[in-house]
């Protein structure tokens, strides 16, 4: 059966590749509207919309959609709009714990799965110079919360409670269980 990742995120492709299955990438076309104060609900809604938008034209396939949001309290912190926004986001998160939710929706011809995972992340205290230098690197610009835990952003993360891959953008443990249930992981360990 065809497996499609409804995302152009190189991080999600990298994580999905860890499961050793062949897949294709078809970008989802959805308006990413946020429900203010509802980060988990927003992430679940967007993951479902992304998967559904691709599945509608590929009903014979298994389509994987995901959405990652960073939040502080109930304030959703999305991708930075520009460098100034990235600096402000990183200042806000400096020295604090925040949460990362990645929602996952899998459409198959037989069944729809919708789940999410949450991890807590603590930044170390960041100097203004560190923030500006990191933003100038360009790494934060396409990432929720303005950092990439798998890149140089790892140097600003002091601690993670939860799954690293949830923070990176795809909850691999939950996805693994779904794909096993769909019998798409033949030959992997049991």
Swiss-Prot record:
HAMAP family: Maf (MF_00528). InterPro entries: ITPase-like_fam, Maf-like. The keyword Ligase does not apply. One of its GO terms (biological process) is nucleotide metabolic process. It is found in: Cytoplasm. Nucleoside triphosphate pyrophosphatase that hydrolyzes dTTP and UTP. May have a dual role in cell division arrest and in preventing the incorporation of modified nucleotides into cellular nucleic acids. The keyword Translocase does not apply. Its cofactor is a divalent metal cation. Belongs to the Maf family. YhdE subfamily. Its EC number is 3.6.1.9. It catalyses: dTTP + H2O = dTMP + diphosphate + H(+); UTP + H2O = UMP + diphosphate + H(+). Coiled coil: none annotated. Keywords: Cytoplasm, Hydrolase, Nucleotide metabolism. PANTHER family: BIFUNCTIONAL DTTP/UTP PYROPHOSPHATASE/METHYLTRANSFERASE PROTEIN-RELATED, BIFUNCTIONAL DTTP_UTP PYROPHOSPHATASE_METHYLTRANSFERASE PROTEIN-RELATED. This is dTTP/UTP pyrophosphatase. The active site is at 67 (proton acceptor). GO terms for molecular function: dTTP diphosphatase activity; nucleoside triphosphate diphosphatase activity; UTP diphosphatase activity. It is an enzyme of class 3 (hydrolase). The record marks 11, 68, 150 as: Important for substrate specificity. It holds the Pfam family Maf. GO terms for cellular component: cytoplasm.
């Amino acid at each position: 059966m065809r497996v499609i990742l409804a995302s152009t995120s190189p991080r999600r492709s990298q994580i999905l590749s860890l499961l050793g299955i062949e897949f294709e990438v078809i970008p989802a076309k959805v308006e990413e509207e946020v429900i203010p104060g509802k980060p988990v609900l927003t992430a679940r809604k967007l993951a479902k919309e992304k998967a559904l938008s691709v599945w509608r034209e590929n009903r014979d396939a298994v389509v994987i959609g995901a959405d990652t949001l960073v939040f502080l309290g109930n304030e959703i912190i999305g991708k930075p709009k520009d460098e100034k926004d990235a600096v402000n986001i990183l200042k806000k998160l400096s020295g604090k714990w925040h949460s990362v939710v990645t929602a996952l929706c899998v459409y198959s011809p037989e069944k729809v799965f919708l789940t999410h995972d949450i991890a807590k992340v603590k930044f170390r205290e960041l100097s203004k110079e560190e923030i500006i230098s990191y933003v100038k690197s360009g790494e934060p610009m396409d990432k929720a919360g303005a950092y990439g835990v798998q890149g140089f952003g790892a140097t600003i993360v002091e601690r993670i409670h939860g799954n690293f891959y949830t923070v990176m953008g795809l909850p691999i443990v939950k996805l693994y269980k779904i794909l096993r249930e769909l019998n798409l992981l033949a030959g992997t360990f049991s």
